[in-house]
Design a protein with these regions (language model features):
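Short, charged/polar N-terminal "headpieces" of proteins
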Residues: 1-23
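Glycine-rich, flexible loop/turn motifs
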Residues: 3, 40, 45, 77-83
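Aromatic side chains
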Residues: 7, 16, 27, 69-72
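Alpha-helical protein-protein interaction elements
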Residues: 8, 19-22, 52, 64, ...
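A short, structured beta-strand/loop element
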Residues: 15-51
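A short mixed-secondary-structure module that forms the rim of ligand-binding clefts
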Residues: 55
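C-terminal structural segments of small proteins and small subunits
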Residues: 58-88
Length: 88
């Protein structure tokens, strides 16, 4: 699962060919013992994150929405995608 971004101890990854599980563009978030799937639109789809970290992820996703959709479109076609700038 390639890493898209890392900031504030939050790791964001996207899986190739992963449109069957949730049927919407999403990415996977890892923070300490927490794991979650978050839609490109910022919706928490599965799992859990502390509120502060979820808000940081949602802010990052809003800033990079176009890049996330581009990465998703590549990922579902098994085409490599690049990293996205972290939240600063």
């Amino acid at each position: 699962m390639p890493e898209l971004c890392r900031f504030y101890n939050i790791v964001i990854k996207m899986i190739y060919s992963d449109n069957d599980q949730h049927h919407k563009p999403h990415f996977h978030v890892y923070y300490a013992e927490y794991e979650a799937s978050v839609g490109v639109d910022g919706e928490l789809i599965a799992g859990s994150l502390p509120v502060k970290q979820l808000k940081l992820v949602q802010a990052w996703a809003a800033i990079h929405e176009d890049e996330l959709y581009a990465a998703w479109n590549n990922a579902v076609r098994n085409i490599p995608f690049g990293k996205i700038e972290p939240l600063r």
